Design a protein with these regions (language model features):
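Structural signature of beta-strand start/N-cap positions in the alpha/beta core
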Residues: 1-2, 100, 158
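Helix-loop "lid/cap" segments that line or gate small-molecule binding pockets
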Residues: 25-26, 45-59, 115, 149
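Conserved SAM-binding loop
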Residues: 11, 83, 101-104, 137, ...
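Metal-dependent phosphoesterase signature
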Residues: 52-89, 97-99
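Substrate-recognition "cap/lid" segment bordering the active-site pocket of phosphatases
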Residues: 108-162
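Phosphate- and divalent-cation-binding pockets in alpha/beta enzyme and binding domains
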Residues: 21, 49, 86, 111-114, ...
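Substrate-recognition element of Asp-dependent hydrolases with the DxDx(T/V) motif
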Residues: 22, 90-117
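Active-site neighborhood of HAD-like aspartate-dependent phosphohydrolases
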Residues: 1-40, 56, 96
Length: 163
């Protein structure tokens, strides 16, 4: 059996962390964002998450904005990231029971790596890790799941997705 996990909202709660980093980062570009501004863009990948809010306030999105948000994210993630209770134990038990695990997240690789490190979840538990940077179409499009199954060397029909 093959299980593909999402990261945010499944293994960890990083939304408050990226939100705080985005508010602080966008402020440096003259955007006075509010937490609720980000709600429509949750799960759409960081380019859209940050860019959508910047554009709402009439500021053109630039890649440097995301870079700055990630700088801030990396500074605060160890204090703010919430790991859901039992996450590590469940992942370790599934691995011990012979399940192939993978991670498919719309987040960028830098965020995935930071979250796994802070959560003390070994990347080696996962047969494949696919980020939003690895696909053209974001969720709910199936591309990320198909790519993850392919990277695992498994047929998509043999994979269970936990979102």
């Amino acid at each position: 059996m093959n299980i593909i996990f999402d990261m945010d909202g499944v293994l960890v709660d990083s939304e408050p962390v990226i939100e705080a980093a985005a508010i602080a980062g966008l402020k440096e570009y003259g955007v006075e964002a509010e937490p609720e501004d980000f709600t429509p863009f949750i799960g759409a990948g960081e380019d859209r998450y940050i860019g959508g809010v910047a554009e709402k306030y009439g500021v053109a999105y630039k890649k440097e904005m995301k870079d700055r948000v990630y700088d801030i994210y990396l500074e605060i993630v160890s204090d703010k990231l919430k790991v859901f209770k039992g996450t590590k134990e469940v992942l370790n038990q599934l691995t011990d029971d012979g399940y192939n695990l993978a991670l498919a997240s719309s987040a960028d690789a830098v965020k995935i790596e930071a979250n796994l490190k802070v959560a003390d979840i070994s990347q080696f538990l996962f047969k494949a890790i696919v980020s939003g940077e690895d696909v053209e179409e974001k969720k709910p499009a199936p591309e990320i799941y198909l790519k993850t199954a392919d990277k695992m060397g498994e047929a998509p029909a043999t994979c269970l997705v936990v979102e």
